[in-house]
Amino acid sequence: LRVLITELNRSASHLVGMGAYGLDLGTFSPFLYAFREREKLLDLFEEVCGARLTYSYITVGGMTADLPPGWLQRCEAFLDQFEPVIREYHTLLTTNAIFVKRTANIGVLSSEMAIDYGCTGPVLRGSGVDIDLRRDGESIYTAMYDGYAFEVAVMKNGHYPRDHEYPAVPRL
């Protein structure tokens, strides 16, 4: 359950980033779509703990309360509709002429340079280095994800828009 809540929170965070990034680059629709999906996630969080943004549901030793009746089914229904729309959003954003014009060949960071600069997390993986603390680290997160198989989004060319062959929006 902790992994599920944590991953849903991560998705909500990435939706904000994706929407705001598109907005900064002149594409308004992806912002609205991303925030629509984020609202659905925040509704699920509110059901679980009464808060939408600053929830304190995960605590030492477990969770602060049981799930409300039917919550897992509502969460599963959300995830069933979420997966296909993420593919749509990816296409809507990364094939947008304005987005492509403003991002192509901008901010390329080689894996060597990323390591030399001490980059971590998504920036390091975006530069082609396959390291993820959920899988490779020694922390509470590694223990929490132990036994779960998941694909880590690692870009090949140091820049997301040139990795068009990568399916969907990798972090979501």
What is each residue range found by the language model?
Residues 1-172:
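Active-site bordering "gate/hinge" segments
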